[in-house]
Amino acid sequence: MKASEEEYRLNFFIKNDFKRKICKSCKTPFWTRDEKKEYCSDIPCTDYYFFDINIKSQPLTVKEAREKFLSFFEKRGHTRISPKPVLARWRDDLYLTIASIVDFQPHVTSGLVPPPANPLVVSQPSIRLEDIDNVGITFGRHLTTFEMAAHHAFNYPDHYVYWKDETTAYATEFFTKELGIPEEELNFKESWWEGGGNAGPCLEVTVGGLELATLVFMQYKITDNGNYTPLKLKIVDTGYGVERIAWITQKTPSAFHAIYGNLVYKFFNKIGVAYIDETLLKVASRFAGKIDPDNPDTIKIHRQMVSKELGIDIKAVEEELDRAAKVFQILDHTKTIMLMLADGLVPSNSGEGYLGRLVIRRALKVLRLLKSDVRLYELVKEQIDFWKEDFPQVLKNKDYILDAVELEQQRFEKILEKVPSIASTLARKSEITTEDLIQVYDSNGIPPDLLEEELKKKSVKFELPRNFYALVAKRHQTSTIKSVYDKVKLPKDMLEYITALQPTEKLYYKDQYMRSFEGKVLGVYKNYLILDKTTFYPEGGGQLGDTGLIIDEKSSKRYEVIDTQKVNDVIVHILKEEPSTIKVGDNVRGEINWERRYRLMRHHTVTHVILAAAKKVLGEHVWQAGAEKTPEKGRLDITHHKTLTEEEVKLIENYANSVISDRRPVKPLEMNRMEAEMKYGVSIYEGGVPNSATIRLLEIKDWDIESCGGTHVSNTSEIGAVKIINVERIQDGVIRLEYVAGPALVDYIRETEAKIVEASKIIGSSPDQLTSRLRRLLNEIEEKNNLIIQYRRIIETELLNNLKPYEINGNKIYIIEGLGDEEENKEILRKLTSTDNTIAISISDNRLQIATSKNMRVDKIVEELLKGGGKGGGKGTFANVILNSKKSKEEIIEIVRKSL
């Protein structure tokens, strides 16, 4: 949508003598107080000339720039709020926090819940991977991690806060009064913003070639057919670049120097590469606005401009700038890695973990291209020491961060062993496409840059896309949201039937111990029954739906409820048979299977207990990746970067049982969504993100609080005790814990006792002597195995010394009948065929093992053998064959003769 000029013709501009100009280069309208200005002061229309602007502000570090911004707006009636994590775990459609507005999407921006303050100010650390391939090349214009300082105002129909004029006035005052940028250097470039289904006009604030801020006025909703409809809630969505504010005040050769200070020089030193000539860097940075990373020709032109300006050979310029760009990439990526892991990301092959691993592996690839032997965790450690005051969580989670990074490097080094074989496979293709490279990366984790080296050896050329990592990240940066209808186990016609029915009153929230109730029938469809109220809990949050009975009060007929499901707020009772005596309007009585429900309640509550215990033992990076509660056992999947040790499992179990024996109260709470987030953080969403203004929390006193809609015991003592019965790694970065509690634990103990008694009987021992008896048996078996090995060696030696070969056309053929197991045979055959022109065959009934010396081909013999029927095959000098019928030694020799 192209906004009209009137959208930007603000009273503020008119009153303060701003003139609307058209940029001579890009033809975009912009507002300025400099009547002589011809360009919009944005790149590529101009170079970075902010180096020459007299700015009154003292040089600001990132920390000082952040505080100056926050304090400025705090003094002007804005409430300072804490930033959210860089992992957008309050969203089910997005993995990373890419901007400050994400903090309030979708529930505040949709009007479902009020903002935490209005107006407010925040400095939100953000991560965007769409520019990952451009980092370093543009001297700091592109970063994967940055702080978006923002002030937001939410204008409701009945509550106006402020809009365009005030927002523009704030920007002008901040940049000219607080930073001391000359008023004539400040420009407001007209633009248009769209994102997250919303849109609106925006103004880009440019100074000396740098875009310092974007002022978005979110006022339209984009409909499914692409039309724009006005929003009732109009939002001021601003974004000021904290790092760019630091850069423009410091005027350092690159933004990296402004962001990282002395860490820049330390990284060059630790990585083991020479620091770049600073004069060259300053000139290159000034001309950097000419670089469009999507157009490689502009990079070449930029290098030529630097070469000409300094009178330096262009190859020397390219070498210096390429080396510096790689170090800048490592600086940027290690900070991103640090923030991701500090907020709980566990590297893996899916979800947010995939994106974390992508950044780690790109950093490792760059280190490899620089031929550096520094360990990546050493560089991340430097980042932690540098940023620990700004981001306390990085110091708190330091051990996990460094451990996870080192483990990822070890895995990456192991993966690189596959490069030659992967390159050989690719080399056989007539053309290597970008899709091929992405598939190789997704399947094997091998960066195309490293494949390129190997493919060059094979004289294979391919085009490496400059934005490869951005392409890969784009495929994985969002999560597919399942429709509510995709999550339920009901047929489509049933889903259509219930759309007109009113919400069901949830009696299980009023009293989780209610076993029976009376309700009115609102709907009957096949074997599905809908009531006005129910105490049957529908499947959700990993807890199975209740079972029980529905009793027709007229006929007293009892119908078995085999499952309970929910669609939106309508609860559906699934009966074993169609309720022939029940019709709409009837009154019925419901009785849940209480013993089953109580087991589910115990297993659900203990899941919360174990999750908090796992965090305590393993670290705050642990996050619930899935859960299931059945009457028989509970299951919890957690994110963790390595297999659990026995000691860690014991500690988790001990903490859980300690909480159970402490008799801690378990209390459900209902809170305003935003209030809950502000008070407890986004960890309340471990079990999922509810779509409601008010959310239900479960609090285990002084232990855990989490959003949960399940049914629970009211005190941890009701759980009885818990035992973790199984721990396994189910996928990369995810560990599964299975456990039993209460009566299920008693069942488990009885079953285990029965197995011990049975095992004792089998080996002729009593249960209390089972261990010692087993140990003796194993020692005896080991002794006998050693004896068997000795006898086999004697037989093998005797066989090799006395076995006479058949001679066929100068070839030796050894035939062995009915000897040992396959591995033993293979070793004997290998020894027999150690000299040229030798074939050895082991026969066991209709099974053959065939070996040949290196100068012969086993496949020809196999081919001849299979002519008579059978199956088998081999590779190189060894094969296995199963014939349809047993053949004599003489018949096999004849077949071999034919193959020769």
UniProtKB/Swiss-Prot annotation:
Record note on cofactor: Binds 1 zinc ion per subunit.
Cofactor: Zn(2+)
Main location: cytoplasm
Taxonomic path: Archaea, Thermoproteota, Thermoprotei, Sulfolobales, Sulfolobaceae
Enzyme Commission no: 6.1.1.7
BP-aspect Gene Ontology terms: alanyl-tRNA aminoacylation
Protein's UniProt name: Alanine--tRNA ligase
Gene behind this protein: alaS
Xref: SMART domains: tRNA_SAD
Free-text note on domains in this protein's UniProt record: Consists of three domains; the N-terminal catalytic domain, the editing domain and the C-terminal C-Ala domain. The editing domain removes incorrectly charged amino acids, while the C-Ala domain, along with tRNA(Ala), serves as a bridge to cooperatively bring together the editing and aminoacylation centers thus stimulating deacylation of misacylated tRNAs.
Family: Belongs to the class-II aminoacyl-tRNA synthetase family.
HAMAP family per record: Ala_tRNA_synth_A
Known role: Catalyzes the attachment of alanine to tRNA(Ala) in a two-step reaction: alanine is first activated by ATP to form Ala-AMP and then transferred to the acceptor end of tRNA(Ala). Also edits incorrectly charged Ser-tRNA(Ala) and Gly-tRNA(Ala) via its editing domain.
